[in-house]
Amino acid sequence: MTVFTAGMEFFVFHRDRPGSLALRDDLLQEHWSYMDRFATGMIARGPVFTADGENLVGSVHIADLPDLAGGRAFALEEPYYQAGVFRDVLLRRWRNVLGRTMWEFPGGTVGEDDGGYLVLGLGSGPVPDSEATDEMVTQDALVTYGPLLCDDGRTRVGTVALVQAASAAEARGVLGSGNDVDSQYAVVEVYRWQFGGRR
């Protein structure tokens, strides 16, 4: 098991602007070369799609980086971002509750047809532990899981999970169910996701 302790862990969600797919394709090698520089601290990465899997939404990267300045530089100096592929970026500190990378996921590689999802819950509340709160999603189905944090590393502002599930509704269950979710999260977003990196 790999546990990163050297710096700060960050969740970065770059969301594409409409009509940027051709530019994204043109800059793919530059993007990969840029990410190669952060390989030792990479916890998870990959493209994100609409819940039906049909349309590319953007990409996520979860990485261990030296400090706040390093996190901002990682997100904003990325070639796609600099070239205008993305319309916006969500950058937050994050805590690796499971203490592993996506490459250590017991279920193996999560590809296009393997039921991978990004679950993003935004809102305050208690920091979740490593146990999924819905019986439909077990810890073995969690690729990564942890709270989103403010810069101070203490104030929780949400939860992020990459999970393997049979449906978007099942994936959403990692945050809980019914009133529990509604009371803790102002917004819950679920997207399709798959392992990223060099092909």
Explain the meaning of each model-derived region.
Residues 1-199:
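Conserved, structured core segments of small domains
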